[in-house]
Amino acid sequence: KRQGSYNMIVAMSKVLEKAGGFQTVNVNPDSPGGMGAPYLFASGNTDLAFINGAPAKWAMEEGTLGKPATSGYAAVIGGLTAVCYINCVSNAFLQKYNVSTIEEIFEQKLPLRIGCSAKGSMDAEGAYLLLEYFGVTEDDLKSWGGSITNQGGDANADAIADGQIDFYIDHTSSASSTMAQIATSVDVTFLQWGDDLCSWFVSEKGFDLITIPANSFKGQDKELTLPGTPDCVFCKESLSEDVVYAITKSLSENRDALVAEYNSLSPWEPETAWEEMKRGGCPLHPGAEKYYKEAGYMK
C-alpha cells in the first residue's frame, strides 16, 4: 500500500523535472507511516511529502506516536485521494451475538478480534480511535476476549477467512484489493457507523466524510459514508514562495496525466485542492495560495 504512494510520488517528481523546470527530484522510499510522516520535515532533508491531512494537524497540535508536537511544514495540495475507514465484520460473528452495528459490539463488550496494519499507520489508527471513542482500553478489549492484531493486508485477509479475527479495518478506497479479496472469500458485512461516531471523527479528530459507492465490494449493497482523511502533498515551510508556486502549478496543470497513470488520484480536483477540509485544517503554503488565487480557484 505504501508502495502505491511511492509510485505516485515518483510520477509527480517526473512531472516536476519535465514540466516544472526542477533539475533533479530525489525520492526517498523510506516511509515512517501516515502517523510518523509529519516528522520527516524536522530532519531538514525533506522538501515534499505525502501525508494524510488529519495526522499532519495532530502532529502540529499535540504530537503523534508519543512524540512532542512538530512544525515546519505547510500544505501544497489537498484531497488527492478518497480514502476512509472501510471496515467489515464476519457474518458468523454478527449471527453468533445477534448484533448488526459497531456500536452494539462495543456497548455489549463483545469479544471482537480486530485485525489491522502496523501501529503507526493510518489504518491501525482507526482501530485505536474506535477504542478511544467508546472509552475502552486495549486491556478492556482483551478482558472481554477480544484483541487487536497488527499485520499486513494479506495476513488479515487470511486471518478473517480462517476465523482468527472477526473484524478488519483499513484506511483505504473503494479500489482496495484486500477488501475485495475478503468480500469474495468470506461472508462479511461492511459496517456503516452511526452519526454520532462519524461526527466525532469529524469534529474531534479533523476527518472528512467520504462516500464509498454501493457495490464497490461483493455483498456491499448500500453506499457507505465513513470518516477518512485524504492524502495531501505537504512541503517544507521554509521553501520560497516561487518554488512552491512552481510545484503547485506544474502538478496541478498535469493532474489529468497523473490521474490517467494512477486512478486512485482521481478525487484530486485542483479547483478544490486548497480547501481547509481537504488539507486537514493545516496552513496552506503562500506559494500554493498564490497559484490557487491566480488560477481563480481561491478568492
Where are these regions (language model features)?
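Ligand-binding clefts/hinges and TM-proximal coupling segments of bilobed small-molecule sensing domains
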Residues: 100-129, 208-272, 276
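Pocket-lining segment of extracytoplasmic ligand-binding domains
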Residues: 53-55, 61-64, 71-77, 92-94, ...
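Bilobed "Venus flytrap"/periplasmic-binding protein-like clamshell domains
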Residues: 1-30, 85-162, 274, 278-287
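N-terminal segment of the mature folded domain
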Residues: 33-84
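Extracytoplasmic/secreted proteins, especially bacterial periplasmic and envelope-associated proteins
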Residues: 4-11, 15, 36, 40, ...
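An extracytoplasmic/periplasmic, membrane-proximal ligand-sensing/linker region
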Residues: 8, 162, 167, 172-184, ...
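Active-site catalytic pocket residues across diverse enzymes, especially alpha/beta-hydrolases
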Residues: 16, 20, 45, 63-64, ...
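Loop/turn elements at helix/coil->beta-strand transitions in domains of secreted/extracellular proteins
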Residues: 21-23, 45-48, 71-74, 109-113, ...
